[in-house]
Amino acid sequence: MVDWTEKYRPASLSEVRGNDTARDALAEWAETWPDHREAVVVHGSPGIGKTSAAHALANDAGWDVVELNASDQRTADVVERVAGEAARSGTLTGGSGGRKLVLLDEADNLHGNIDRGGSAAITRLVDDAPQPIVLVANEYYEMSSSLRSACREIEFRDVSKRSIVPVLRDVCRREDVTYEEDALAAIAEQNAGDLRSAVNDLQALAEQDRTLTADDVVMGERDRTEGVFDYLDDVIATHSAREALQAAYDVDETPDDLLSWVADNVPKDYRGGELADAYEFLSNADVWLGRVRATQNYAYWRYATDNVAAGVAAARRHDHGGWTRYGPPSYWRKLGSSRATREKRDYVARHIAETAGCSMATARNDVLPFLRVLTHHCKNRELTVAMAAAYELDTEHVAFVTGSGETTNKVASIVADAEERRTDAAVDHSEGAFAGAVREDNTDEDSAADETTDGDEDTGADSQRGLDEFF
């Protein structure tokens, strides 16, 4: 099963529809690039042909393409290694004129530690690269000002309904789909300027029967919901991509959850090649969901839904008969069975983070494994008591960290000693706070207090000695 948006991706800029002005500006930028050597930012809404136009441009010019998008990690090191090296080495290995097109997709989505230093590295790259560079963005002003100022800007606008309909008509002719004009108009209207989504909907509705009427088009608000098991019947147990897409809109589940349900249950009904095709569609859906997580652009949910619903249904070739018992995703069952363990882990990590002033992730991934080794089965009792005192751990959490039995006397005595240490430390702190209120003429009491304080300081020092050895 071939994705029609890929099958009919424009091979030349002349085939790009709905953005003639932007298309011509991109062609002019490429033709004059040796004179100005500027990078260009192509920006606009999702699904209107920005990335396709960049690939079509490279095809026209005979340039190879090196691409980085939001599915890739884009730290400074990665940008330098992949895009930077490609830009510098293109003169030796590239296509026409020895050039490569460096394509940085979703350039407006560089996030925190995930893409650490990526924006600065891209800015340096566009300033110095001896190869043409195209940056693609949905939100132009989400890019850094320094990066915007270093590039030429070309805006792609939403594709109008009258531009979408001829594209759908052309796809129908190539795919031998009999169609009603009103159906194409309805798809174009429904997809509000998103050409890619319009082609996806056309494929979902027309691929099976090769006919398309206005009544077939899913339109308007859906005012009913169905259960997830009904949805699985519509997607897995039938051949109709159209019904599967309708069911996906009717069921009250997110695309992430639908993917989990279908991925776990489709092997119960599909065989051989049809199973392989179904998993290819699920893989495509997962790619789109990854882009949602990377960019927080939930418009991409639509493309994931097309794959996980209509794509999987279209992959079915045979009716295997019988009744299939569907069940919830095994991943969810595993999460349920491990919930108690995860709750204990997070409790300990939270107390470590609050005490040490680090993040939960650092506490969970770096500090906690270290503590487990040092306190394994409570063999180093002093350290285990110090840990329990410092992080205020009770019996179940000491047992979790050390791997010891929760009901053993050893763990109970460690928790009791830790509680005593915390109490002693609190008393010592309170006495220090009121030391100035002791009467000057009560020298005997002062001496006694001094002795007590000295003893408590020794105890306080003991309570910290074990923790010092952790760090």
From Swiss-Prot:
Gene Ontology terms for molecular function: ATP binding; ATP hydrolysis activity; DNA clamp loader activity
Note down the stretches annotated as region Disordered: 422-471
Q: Which Pfam families match?
A: AAA, RCF1-5-like_lid
* Database matches in SMART domains: AAA
Q: Which terms under GO biological process does the entry name?
A: DNA replication
Reply yes or no: does the keyword Cell division apply: no
User: Known HAMAP family for this protein?
Assistant: RfcL
Q: Which family does it belong to?
A: Belongs to the activator 1 small subunits family. RfcL subfamily.
For this protein, the record's PANTHER family field holds: CHROMOSOME TRANSMISSION FIDELITY FACTOR 18, REPLICATION FACTOR C SUBUNIT 1
Self-association state and partner proteins as the record states? Heteromultimer composed of small subunits (RfcS) and large subunits (RfcL).
Q: This protein is called what?
A: Replication factor C large subunit
Q: Source taxonomy lineage?
A: Archaea, Methanobacteriati, Methanobacteriota, Stenosarchaea group, Halobacteria
